[in-house]
Amino acid sequence: HKSLPDAQVYAPLAHPIETLRLLLTKTPLEHEAIMALRGLANGPVDAQVHAHMAKIFRDPELRPRANQSFHDGHRHTYQRLQHLMRQLPEGIHGFAQPQLLMAVASHAAINDPSLFMGCVIQQGLCIGTLLAFEQDHPHSAQWRHQLETGARLGVYALTEIGRSNSHMGACVEAVFDPQTRTFVLNTPNKAALKFANVGINNLDKMGVVFAQVTVQGQACGVFAFVLPLSDAKGPRPGVCMSSPAEIRAVPLDYGLASFDRVRLPFDAWLCDGASIDAANHFHDPLGSTDRRLIRSLFAPKNVWAMVGIGLSSVMLACATLALTHANRRTTQARIGNGTGLLAFRTQRRALFGCLATAYVMKCFANDSARLWIEGTASQASLQTTGSGDVTWTPWAAISQTLALTKALCAPAAEALATECRLRCGVAGALNLNRFADYEGMAK
């Protein structure tokens, strides 16, 4: 329509990655419709927080490098993660201002999916686990501070390679030794190898390792243990860490870890109200191994909120890139020489459909993030643990809404990024424009 203003160019293809962030920070304020859309994009995060986070992510130290080997790329990702942890405002520590974590998720996802996954593991999983279980624990707050400042890197070791749904019953054992009141952490077979970000094994990494606690021959449930996995000299005694597997979708140093009768002090156990008395009797106030499993897997709800925000931000970025490209580009086809691509119905239907999907998923992810933000104040309470039985997986018992957010956002983001990439022709295939990276992030 002739009365419509010219399309605002947010992020032309082949421009530096920071132009994508203009979607969140530089929309034209004079148009009420644009303001409304900006509010939808910001979601539960204040515009000032987005602006501050955009400034942090403009730091050249956080930019990914091109044409690196897998090993060099993994190391650079961790360097950037540690640099980012040092730059973040104090309010993110202990999730005191939970909207800051959502802002990190949004900007990290657009900046680089590998850095985003590093943030998910470091903040959502490892810091989130320590925060949830640090009440009355002598060292948990100290460990959390080391991760929050980037002094150490977190490894979340839950998945075991040999079985589907391995989180339902960890085979790695933490056997209580009544003589020394310590635990012996052991990987019984190759099926119990942990699959986690352990491939670069000469960095200072701290593991949050999930194991079946066994007391006097009785399986007492899955709990988290915290232990040093590696330092500059390599893996710690009794810890074996494989070289990284090459996963092109989202490059990170995923590999296999095992434990050969590693002796852990009693305080390595994030007991979370459970206890072993002087007579070596195990007690758990939750009363069942199913409830304990749900409780131990508390931190993934942080990840689902982060992933929902991250993927929905990526969807908006993809739609913006593709529409900007189509709006600026003409065709020399005989059917319409000099005609803009958006004049063709097939292009409009595809790209406006992508834009609509992006906004719908963004609204859904924002609502889920609001629920997560509202729930952070009570997240450490034992009373918030679900009481239902675990059947297929424990995720629905942890949070139905947040689990659904991840389940819906991931395939939507993959399909949308693929469609936008195809609609941009050769420009969509350029690594600089990140469509393939965003597809991989959603897989």
Locate predicted features:
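Amphipathic, small/basic residue-rich leader segments at the start of a protein or domain
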Residues: 1-142, 146-153, 165, 176, ...
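Conserved short loop/turn motifs at secondary-structure junctions
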Residues: 125-135, 158-162, 336-340, 401-406
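A general structural signal for short secondary-structure junctions and capping/turn motifs
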Residues: 144-149, 164, 175-177, 198-201, ...
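A gly/ser-rich beta-alpha-beta helix-loop segment of oxidoreductase catalytic cores
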Residues: 155-174
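Long amphipathic alpha-helical scaffold regions
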Residues: 170-177, 206, 210
